[in-house]
Amino acid sequence: MNSMSEYVKPRKNEFLRKFENFYFEIPFLSKLPPKVSVPIFSLISVNIVVWIVAAIVISLVNRSLFLSVLLSWTLGLRHALDADHITAIDNLTRRLLSTDKPMSTVGTWFSIGHSTVVLITCIVVAATSSKFADRWNNFQTIGGIIGTSVSMGLLLLLAIGNTVLLVRLSYWLWMYRKSGVTKDEGVTGFLARKMQRLFRLVDSPWKIYVLGFVFGLGFDTSTEVSLLGIATLQALKGTSIWAILLFPIVFLVGMCLVDTTDGALMYYAYSYSSGETNPYFSRLYYSIILTFVSVIAAFTIGIIQMLMLIISVHPMESTFWNGLNRLSDNYEIVGGCICGAFVLAGLFGISMHNYFKKKFTPPVQVGNDREDEVLEKNKELENVSKNSISVQISESEKVSYDTVDSKV
């Protein structure tokens, strides 16, 4: 047993070492840690494999299915940019980074859970399209209320929790500016403690998967792909259920690719700290900027979903409510705007980093330098005194030896 373990372990370390050497030799990858780039390129590889399999199936079954499959994949890419996806993934990533369980694959598990609803719905639709279509409106209404309620509640809770975190980060930056304190402590009020206990519930992949599944009960994604499946069954009589399953599968991998990229890049942005002489300030600085954008986005989308839930239960006619309906029909535009806001915030942070770094340099550093000089001088004096004492001791010993020799 021991000999085998001693043999396997060096092989494993050697493999990891070779992989790291190969990875960091690639110019455009060396700036990203493997924890960020590996999930993204893994999903790119999965998409390529799925499309190869889909091409084989389409060529064997019916080549006219290609456009429908391509449309399903495009719908997955588009739906991944929906505002509730982007906001939930970004806020969950930020919350997990403030714990001891940070994850760069929040978007992956969230989109897989979300797409599971699509897959189950398409199987039911493909098996019982004629009977299920008559009752589809009831399922859509009930699922819309459940999914929107859960999404709204989670986003508002995430917004409140990240607001608490934003206050805490601002307090730490103020303490650092005032006295140079770099310990992450200070805000330990009742609300902060309650929010920490609440968000500890979402601390593992399967819990994020469940959240994505519940979000999917809104049936917005299921409507697109399932109606596509019904239309395909109507147009292509005799198409097998296995061919119909291509639609939710390509939808899943397309949506998972975009959400994984978003989650991994936000993980990198939130955990970013420059390799400068002051990484503590850089970490606080970028965290405050991105957390502020996350709070604004979460509150905005949560309030919009609350208003959408009200109008779905009690329809109303006015310019405001009609505009809200048009906004809900173009949800991917809102998600794209949120992504753009994060990009602009990141560019602003990079461009203004040096300015704020100089402004927030704690004046206590000068005092510390003076204290260091005093300590060095004290050490020199102590060394001098020790040397003088040792010299005195050596001279006394020498004298004693001389006296002994004279007596002898």
Curated annotation (Swiss-Prot):
Q: Which UniProt keywords apply?
A: Endoplasmic reticulum, Membrane, Nickel, Transmembrane, Transmembrane helix, Transport
Its domain of life reads: Eukaryota
User: What is one GO biological process annotated to this record?
Assistant: nickel cation import across plasma membrane
Among the Pfam families in the record, one is NicO
Q: Which residue ranges run through the membrane?
A: 38-58, 106-126, 141-161, 210-230, 238-258, 288-308, 333-353
- Where does it reside? Endoplasmic reticulum membrane
Q: How does it sit in the membrane?
A: Multi-pass membrane protein
Q: Does the keyword Membrane apply?
A: yes
For this chain, one GO molecular function annotation is:
high-affinity nickel cation transmembrane transporter activity
List S-S links within the chain: none
Which GO cellular component terms are attached? Answer: endoplasmic reticulum membrane; plasma membrane
Mainly resides where? endoplasmic reticulum
What family does this belong to? Belongs to the NiCoT transporter (TC 2.A.52) family.
Its biological purpose: High-affinity nickel transporter responsible for nickel uptake. Required for urease biosynthesis.
Q: Tell me the protein's name.
A: High-affinity nickel transport protein nic1
- Gene, per the UniProt record: nic1
